[in-house]
Amino acid sequence: MQGNFGREELRRNGRKQLFDDMPDLNKEQQAIFDDVVESVVNHSPSFKNVFYVDGPAGSGKTFLYRKLIHYLRSKGLIVLIVAVSGIAALLLPGGRTVHSRFRLPVPLPLEGATANITANSGTAQLLRITSLLIWDEAPNAPRAAFDAVSRCLQDVLQDLPNRSKRQPFGGLPVLFGGDFRQIR
């Protein structure tokens, strides 16, 4: 791969994490972990590819994200992490705000927002090799952000095998998480 796009993510993927030394997941976390990993490995547009984890602060969402990130990156896969706020993005390895990652306009219009990512850009190239998108604080994101990111991924990923312009988020597995009790 050429250019400087995604160097940060690729460097992170190259680091070996001591996955086995991490504490175990509980039963509910393990079920979600298994479903998400199966979706990433399966690559089938017919397999479920959109997931949501809900729980209050301290319930283990961030721990589950970290476990998934370390496991998939240890397999050489690219995992992108976004959150609505910069604070939440900083809590996860390589996390960025959804506005920054997908170049969404600020302020975000209520309808018709688009990601400012061209088909030949480095960001588009990074999205094409991404295996999983983790989106924290999802309940706090406006609908326009979901629509813009989904359209962007549908456009960028449409020519890839096992991806589909008709699928939400272009068929890329996406794990949403958050706490509906914290909606502004």
Q: What label would you give each PLM region?
A:
Residues 1-184:
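Conserved ATP-binding/catalytic motifs of P-loop helicase motor domains
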